């Protein structure tokens, strides 16, 4: 059983101040939520564990223990690349991967390569979703860099999730992924390069998944 992880419940990534200026990430949206007045609305609510920093390894140890106790054995981390560098990696790198019990839980990446708009910003999300703050489209050269980094930093972890000896890698926005290469044929070549690099790193292959979210 796998659970998606939206790694924004931290203030450790400075660039999140664009959306949550108070400095503790998505918790700012949670705390600002009010009762909408319809039957069954249960807001405001306070998290059972409080407004914890999920980039803290001690917090992740607690969450791993809880997830495992309910049968969850894979975390799918939303992973981002904006403005020519990774974004929102703190919860994965500093939280999950430094948790002393992380070998109890497999993990994998879903490259959330959609455009970043004001959707995350409660102050503007109801009025402006057309402005692109960061594009999810990268160049083929950047994608090659992402592949190298992903293989070295994540695939080689003993608890990275695999199917039949192949690391599992997911892409969220298929349209943006194709735009990265320009054509579906070039996109295929990009995936073949990723698979080749993965095999050269000692794996049996690459298990590629795509999300049809539209």
Q: What kind of region is each of these model predictions?
A:
Residues 1-214:
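Glycan-processing catalytic domains of CAZymes
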């Amino acid at each position: 059983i796998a659970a998606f992880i939206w790694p924004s419940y931290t203030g450790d990534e400075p660039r999140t101040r664009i959306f949550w200026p108070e400095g503790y990430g998505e918790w700012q949206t949670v705390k600002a939520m009010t009762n909408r007045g319809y039957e069954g609305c249960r807001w405001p609510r306070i998290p059972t564990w409080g407004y914890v920093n999920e980039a803290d390894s001690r917090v992740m140890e607690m969450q791993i223990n809880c997830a495992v106790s309910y049968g969850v054995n894979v975390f799918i981390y939303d992973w981002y690349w904006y403005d020519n560098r990774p974004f929102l990696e703190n919860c994965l790198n500093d939280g999950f991967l430094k948790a002393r019990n992380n070998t109890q839980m497999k993990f994998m990446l879903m490259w959330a390569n959609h455009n970043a708009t004001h959707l995350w910003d409660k102050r503007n999300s109801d009025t402006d979703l057309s402005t692109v703050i960061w594009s999810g489209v990268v160049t083929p050269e950047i994608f090659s860099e992402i592949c190298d980094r992903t293989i070295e930093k994540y695939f080689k972890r003993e608890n990275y999730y695999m199917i039949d000896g192949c690391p599992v890698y997911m892409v969220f926005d298929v349209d943006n992924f194709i735009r990265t290469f320009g054509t579906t044929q070039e996109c295929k070549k990009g995936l073949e390069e990723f698979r080749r690099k993965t095999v050269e790193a000692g794996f049996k292959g690459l298990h590629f998944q795509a999300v049809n979210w539209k």
